[in-house]
Amino acid sequence: AIVHDVMPVFELFQPTTVDDTLALLDTYGADAWVLAGGLDTFDWFKDRNKRRKVVVDLSGVESLRGVKKAADGGLEIGASTTLTDVANDPLVKQNYRLLSQAAALVASPQIRNQGTLGGNVSQDTRCWYYRSGWTCYRAGGNICYADTPTAINREHAIFDANRCVAV
């Protein structure tokens, strides 16, 4: 039986430097989960077989937050920078208006205030079937349950897909 909404036991580390973070990730490897905003993390922990022995919380690593002009004239945005900060940053607004506008349109204000750029770039698939433990293509199976006539597929891009239609 699948038990939902049960938070697994894990050890929490809260490094304050990138070097300490990398050392923890090197030590624990695949047993570690990186936490930034956490919007996706706890759903995965409660509702699927994603279990990690260690959670590395990046919230104390100041150097991973913020926006600054890069040496080459481009832009550097830290992985722990919230989407609200990206949307409202003067450098982004002035030089990368489309990025500012896009960040301002993601989800709700609450999610933009908590969600990070790194987390949004690296979040896992939103497919209801995949997240519920079905043995679909993405989970190693041989079928995409979202791409069937009776599927619950509201969150999927089902146009011109060849295997997995999840986004």
List each model region and its residues.
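C-terminal structural segment of proteins
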Residues: 1-167
